[in-house]
Curated annotation (Swiss-Prot):
InterPro entries: Alpha/beta_knot_MTases, tRNA_m1G_MeTrfase_C_sf, tRNA_m1G_MeTrfase_TrmD, tRNA_m1G_MTases_N, tRNA_MeTrfase_TRMD/TRM10. It comes from Bdellovibrio bacteriovorus (strain ATCC 15356 / DSM 50701 / NCIMB 9529 / HD100). One of its GO terms (molecular function) is tRNA (guanine(37)-N1)-methyltransferase activity. Gene3D superfamilies: 3.40.1280.10, tRNA(m1g37)methyltransferase, domain 2. Its main location: cytoplasm. GO terms for biological process: tRNA N1-guanine methylation. GO terms for cellular component: cytosol. PANTHER family: TRNA (GUANINE-N(1)-)-METHYLTRANSFERASE. It catalyses: guanosine(37) in tRNA + S-adenosyl-L-methionine = N(1)-methylguanosine(37) in tRNA + S-adenosyl-L-homocysteine + H(+). Pfam families: tRNA_m1G_MT. The keyword Membrane does not apply. Homodimer. Specifically methylates guanosine-37 in various tRNAs. This is tRNA (guanine-N(1)-)-methyltransferase.
């Protein structure tokens, strides 16, 4: 079982958030352990001080090194991976979340105020992770994003064994649109193929629609996906289909105007496939 210890000045933010939904069920089922710890328990003064002014001046306070270090030492062991949530870190990706889910023990450090002392980072932190190119008031939300993202790759956490593998980004593509009852709603009909019962046909259709959605919404990801598909295509001795982009264009042409609309693909045109 993956054990996660979160070091934060606001442990109630962590414990409250992980007690609901999928994470809450994972904790109850002993598939995952999340505990929050505060440096305040090691503060020796009557005000339980955990921050101080930075040397050289500047805006914001810095978390005190001594109390933070003791918090780290309390939970760290030889198999721990210590992560500092920081806007300077590498951006969290689906692959990174999957990698972290394989760890034995994670220690997530949540900064506050102006951050933490660089010497703590130099000595204890194995990796800095960011959840995006923006700044938050603390690392707690980032830690929760990391926990939620990695938990989806832990066997048994999601209701369906294939759920994580079919989510957006799992194969380098965004997820296809999903529909439920009623069949017709807001003047839009569910695509007929999804009602066919032909599982192979549906799976192939969903993959191509995912590619089209990625082309429209994340062309940067589509370029990477297309390069990989072209490499696979070149390796084939017997080519039963057209070149990947041409094959996708052909599929798009065969979609009815109604299907393009309900799938949110009506903005694509022939120029979209010039790549």
């Amino acid at each position: 079982m993956l054990k996660i210890d979160v070091i934060t000045l606001f442990p109630e933010m962590i414990q409250g958030a992980v007690s609901h939904g999928v994470l809450g069920q994972a904790l109850k089922g002993d598939l995952l352990s999340v505990q929050a710890h505060t440096p305040r328990e090691f503060a020796s003064d009557k005000h339980r001080t955990v921050d101080d002014r930075p040397f050289g001046g500047g805006d914001g306070m810095i978390m005190l090194s001594e109390t933070l270090e003791k918090s780290i030492q309390k939970v760290q062991h030889k198999n721990s991976k210590v992560i500092y949530l920081s806007p300077q870190g590498s951006v969290l990706t689906d692959d990174k979340a999957r990698e972290l889910s394989q760890a034995e023990h994670l220690v997530l450090i949540c900064g506050r105020y102006g951050g933490i002392d660089q010497r703590i980072i130099n000595t204890y932190v194995d990796e800095e992770i960011s959840i995006g190119d923006y700044v938050l008031s603390g690392g707690e939300l980032g830690a929760l994003v990391v926990i939620d993202a990695l938990s989806r790759f832990i066997p048994g956490v999601l209701g369906h064994v294939d759920s994580a593998d079919k989510d957006s980004f799992s194969e380098g593509l965004l997820e296809h649109p999903n529909f439920t009852r009623p069949r017709e709603y807001l003047g839009q009909d569910v695509p007929e193929v999804l009602l066919s019962g032909n599982h192979k046909l549906i799976a192939d259709w969903k993959e191509k629609v995912s590619a089209l959605v990625t082309l429209k919404k994340r062309p940067d990801l589509f370029i990477i996906y297309l390069a990989e598909e072209r490499e696979k295509y070149r390796a084939l001795k017997k080519k039963k289909t057209a070149e990947p982009l041409k094959e996708l264009f052909k599929f798009w042409q065969q979609l009815s105007p109604q299907d393009r609309e309900v799938l949110g693909l009506e903005d694509l045109n022939e120029e979209s496939f010039n790549g």
